[in-house]
């Protein structure tokens, strides 16, 4: 989910 890559969005 988005939560799994939430910090990769930075």
Curated annotation (Swiss-Prot):
The modification Phenylalanine amide is found at residue 10. Found in axons of the male accessory glands, the salivary glands, the heart, and the oviduct. It is found in: Secreted. Keywords: Amidation, Neuropeptide, Secreted. GO terms for cellular component: extracellular region. Signal peptide: none annotated. Belongs to the FARP (FMRFamide related peptide) family. Muscle inhibiting agent. Involved in the neural control of the visceral muscles of the heart, accessory glands and oviduct. May be involved in the regulation of saliva secretion. This is SchistoFLRFamide.
């Amino acid at each position: 989910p988005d939560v799994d890559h939430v910090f990769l969005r930075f």
